[in-house]
Design a protein with these regions (language model features):
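Short juxtamembrane and helix-loop transition motifs at transmembrane-helix boundaries
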Residues: 1, 14-28, 82-85
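Membrane-interface helix-boundary motifs at transmembrane edges
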Residues: 1, 50-58, 111-122
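Aromatic-anchored segments of alpha-helical transmembrane domains
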Residues: 6-17, 64-76, 128-139
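A cytosolic-side transmembrane-helix exit/cap motif
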Residues: 24, 78-88, 142-147
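Membrane-embedded alpha-helical segments of multi-pass membrane proteins
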Residues: 31-44, 60, 73, 92-103
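Alpha-helical transmembrane segments in multipass membrane proteins, preferentially the mid-helix core
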Residues: 42-48, 100-119
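Membrane-interface transmembrane-helix boundary segments in multi-pass integral membrane proteins
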Residues: 119-130, 144-221
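Short, highly charged, low-complexity non-transmembrane loops/tails of multi-pass membrane proteins
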Residues: 230-251
Length: 251
């Protein structure tokens, strides 16, 4: 399992030698960093794999399984390829990476390397938001070090500018992003002070807090029930017995 993760990390950098990255320097400089959820997980999963922190392992499982399934069932990147024939290797790379972030955490649980607990499901949304801060930091360093150009005044309101993981807003005509935005409080959608006060602009990262906790938490709970339903049922019985003033029978 660890070797799959290491190979995935190597492949992330080796992709710079194949189209479209090898023929587009600007994209190569941008995408060789970890600027989306999958890329950031590719960078961190090899280190998380040997972590003794159970919340970190739970994060690996929930976000790996959920993000992997979404990417495989709705592969936005391959569908958007303008040159399908010329970029076949990158399409294969895309599917390997997203299969990997799904398969390795799943194998960890199935093979007994890690035991899930429904009580730790908040590690999924919390970990995802921390991951987005990691992505945001990557993008800031990219801009400050010259890997991507700094935004000019006209691009200040462009949600789609270098926005690969919804950090800066829901995107333009993006079904998933627009769905997430439905759960965002209105004050996270406008500029509070300054020259552009009152105009619509999503607060970077903050706009995602409510949608992530609202959506990822119940999804993680449903997934946890596949593996930890017995512990949940036992805890429900204990709680019911306590509320009724009875002591549950010990088997």
């Amino acid at each position: 399992m660890f070797s799959l993760l290491v190979f995935g990390l190597m492949l992330h950098f080796l992709k710079t030698y194949i189209p479209p990255y090898s023929v587009n320097e600007a994209r190569m400089l941008r995408d060789s960093w970890f600027v989306n959820i999958c890329g950031a997980n590719i960078a961190l999963f090899p280190f998380f794999f040997y972590s003794k922190n159970r919340k970190v392992k739970d994060y690996m499982f929930y976000i790996g399984v959920l993000s992997g399934l979404i990417a495989l069932f709705y592969p936005q990147e391959p569908l958007a390829k303008e040159n399908q024939m010329g970029e076949q290797l990158d399409i294969v790379r895309f599917y390997y990476h997203h299969w990997m972030v799904l398969a390795v955490p799943l194998l960890m649980v199935l093979l007994g390397h890690h035991k899930l607990s429904y009580k730790r499901i908040l590690s999924a949304p919390t970990g995802l938001l921390l991951l987005m801060l990691f992505i945001m930091l990557n993008q800031i360093f990219q801009s400050e070090l010259g890997f991507i150009p700094l935004r000019d005044r006209e691009e200040f309101f462009d949600i789609g500018y270098k926005n690969t993981s919804y950090i800066w807003g829901p995107g333009t005509d993006d079904a998933i992003g627009n769905f997430l935005a439905l759960f965002t409080p209105s004050f996270f959608k406008t500029i509070p002070v300054g020259e552009f006060a009152g105009q619509e602009k999503y607060w970077p990262w903050f706009w995602m807090i409510v949608p992530v906790y609202t959506l990822v938490t119940p999804l993680s709970f449903l997934v946890s029930m596949i593996f930890d339903h017995k512990a949940f049922a036992a805890d429900v019985k204990k709680l019911a017995a306590k509320l009724c003033g009875k002591t549950p029978a010990v088997k």
